[in-house]
């Protein structure tokens, strides 16, 4: 069912798309799209529409059910808004607002807004079932109420019913359980909505069988003239069958005594009254009521065509049960045009309509007596000449049969004729006018033009002109054919070409989701002018069902094709190989048999070898224990204390290996404790080794996720002693492993190897512009200065791994270590080394003299006390803030090019030096200093106010989620870090709105106009629609140049 609904919505939006040219990247956005609404018939409806764009550049159009609206005195376009003065039922449907740019020609369609018309015509009571156990009635309503439910009321005689005892109300139904004589009466229902309140035309009379006595209806055989009824007939029971539409009983009024002579009608309605439609009129009913009858129960009624239209009580008491007659209809309904005056019995009409025509009679009835009736009077209405409904323009398909209706009402009946707006006014060939219906036998191009419908009678003549447009339904000249197979990294071409008049537009979708230049990768997806879709560098996620929808004002057509992506080494069985099925099956069976025999042989050999190894290993272990003594226990203890990062073993371990070479070889064969990847990782960590004695003046600044964080000093000679050739060789090897499929995972499990791309190769491959060449030179210059100043101490940040047995903390420690080890960029802090002689392990990182960026911003904003100056430093200028953001973007772009993600980008995790150089760092002081900026979600501390929705929803971290966080960093910069993002919301509320994709972002005050659009795009829900760091760097560079002017 959801797929069907999505398909209907797809076709509806495609219909609106047929009138639009493809939208460019600069297309407008709707700030106030039209809203769906329900309107009472004949009331006014207003649709608002407003889009962003240069003033005077946009103009608006409206579509109704995919057709352009023809405006008249009732349907008006006021500016960009649409107003319908008197809503009719044919106005119901979907309305779409089109905003078109006069400069670029781009056209944008709003989401459809639905108009529902509320009306109420007639109500009837239907019998669904009647037996001794239950009576079931239904209130059938002809009308519509939009989204609001109809209000149904049930009455028995004049008493309103509710669910009580044996009576149960079920929406439109009335159920009476175990009916008895107490349930006898006339059942009616009243339906009401915003349009009207209408009572059922026909009620249902229920009479319990046990209460009907033989002969109670006085149903006797018809006697001939002068024939007397035998006395025996009065004691017999006769079967009565009334005529169709009649009654088996006698009229109650015939069995009642006549009214007193003083009660009479002096003057009734005129014999015949002719009134024009829309004019007022009055029907007279003058009566005399004696004084002695003032306290009696008397009712005055007006009947139309024998049915009660209005009634009023004349006496001082209310007459129950006199409002309606059993077995007859009632026309009593709320209508402000009719007024019954109690003083003189006059019935007034404020405005006559055509349905008021009929025979009227005035009636007075005293309780228990027969009614007094006036002479009937006829009311004739001269109906105004008008079209019903108004003819509208229409599109006819070339070569098909077309019809255009024109109906008119009036007194006398008008004559309807069609004319063509031409020199002679005659209709073209193969076009006939039959009783006001224009029939086109075979629609051709010459039938295009304006046609006028003329209706005339004795009142005069009216006309309506409509436009006939001849269109050609869209059809495929080249339809998509499939399935289409493509290999990964290959090129897939899906053809779709269409012809028609007007020229059809082509819209592609994948798995019922629209594809356009805005929501696809432009480097891989190309929408050619002829409609063909080309996909370059095919990925596995591109596999799916692709649909091509073509359409114009004549209709829509759609074809689907499936794209299958074949990975390396994968294959598909096609229909061409179906004939060779038997040969393939036989080959598979033979292969499986040989493989099974080989497996059995190998398993047998393995079991035999394993038995021998275990026996030999047991003997050698006994010898090892005797020779090594307690060394083995000490080694095992150290191994247990360091589950994440292994240390190099010295002394006894080496001598034992030399003495028991065969035993060691046997152990490695039996069960290896370290993979090749972990050995290589241990080799890398040995290259990063720093002596703990080289650190001095350690001062704790906070606590992170896996341990304490310090600031201290490191001897520069230890850093200068490291060989750069070793690091280059190591990074070259990492690049080789990455190319062979090892990947560059940003985080791995404890004890597993992790490899990244070489920073050197990234520079050679990605830095091609003059800007990047200068960056490489700037990075090399500090290295030369560091070698010349090897005697000075370096300011460092030290992160300790205290939770050595926490697998999650260990994994995060390794991820940050691999991230900072792989990056060599002036915008990212440098990893100096790793101290692993004893617990806890220390990660030694570069630090700056001015510390973290957030505290610097707070100091310049005057929010913290500075110890080095008597007054607060001045706030940063816009150019300086842009320079900070630009440096952070350059650093994050380097992380992206190394195929890593940061996951916690914020001003608190960046550092700034006195030379105004900003670097991306990773203090992550989530336990104390910045604990209020983290929230525990799914048993993990997360910076939820900086995270993209997919990180909270699916724990999915990508470069696009770092771009989301970068936009929040820019928001912090222009707020001087004095506010938290969404500080009016709690952390739980931020998480809930992120999960529901309802968290709204806006740029900070003071943000340059040139950055607002690209920063807002960083916060889009779809990660594919967010920009890249290179695009952000280019935008920031332009903004810096504009700010300096």
Curated annotation (Swiss-Prot):
UniProt-recorded Gene Ontology molecular function terms: ATP binding; cell adhesion molecule binding; protein heterodimerization activity; protein homodimerization activity; protein kinase activity; signaling receptor activity; transmembrane receptor protein tyrosine kinase activity; Wnt-protein binding
GO biological process, one term: internal genitalia morphogenesis
Transmembrane segments: 588-608
Keywords of this entry: Cell adhesion, Cell membrane, Disulfide bond, Glycoprotein, Immunoglobulin domain, Membrane, Neurogenesis, Phosphoprotein, Receptor, Repeat, Signal, Transmembrane, Transmembrane helix
GO CC terms in record: axon; plasma membrane; receptor complex
SMART domains recorded: IG, IGc2, TyrKc
Biased composition regions of type Basic and acidic residues, renumbered to the chain: 725-736
Region of interest: Disordered: 628-676, 722-790
Residue intervals on the Cytoplasmic side: 609-1045
Cross-referenced Pfam families: I-set, Ig_3, PK_Tyr_Ser-Thr
Residues that carry a glycan: 344, 424, 435, 442, 450, 463, 518, 530
Stretches assigned to the Protein kinase domain: 695-1040
UniProt superkingdom: Eukaryota
Modified residues (Phosphoserine): 681
Ranges of biased composition (kind: Gly residues): 743-752
InterPro entries xref list: Ig-like_dom (IPR007110), Ig-like_dom_sf (IPR036179), Ig-like_fold (IPR013783), Ig_I-set (IPR013098), Ig_sub (IPR003599), Ig_sub2 (IPR003598), Kinase-like_dom_sf (IPR011009), Prot_kinase_dom (IPR000719)
Family: Belongs to the protein kinase superfamily. Tyr protein kinase family. Insulin receptor subfamily.
PANTHER family: TYROSINE-PROTEIN KINASE RECEPTOR, TYROSINE-PROTEIN KINASE RYK
Biological role stated in the UniProt entry: Acts as a calcium-dependent, homophilic cell adhesion molecule that regulates neural recognition during the development of the nervous system. Component of the repulsive Plexin signaling response to regulate motor axon guidance at the embryonic stage. Also component of a receptor complex that is required in the adult visual system to innervate the lamina layer; specific targeting of R1-R6 axons.
Known partners and oligomeric status: Interacts with plexA; component of a receptor complex that mediates the repulsive signaling in response to Semaphorin ligands.
Protein name per the record: Tyrosine-protein kinase-like otk
Classification lineage: Eukaryota, Metazoa, Ecdysozoa, Arthropoda, Hexapoda
Gene: otk
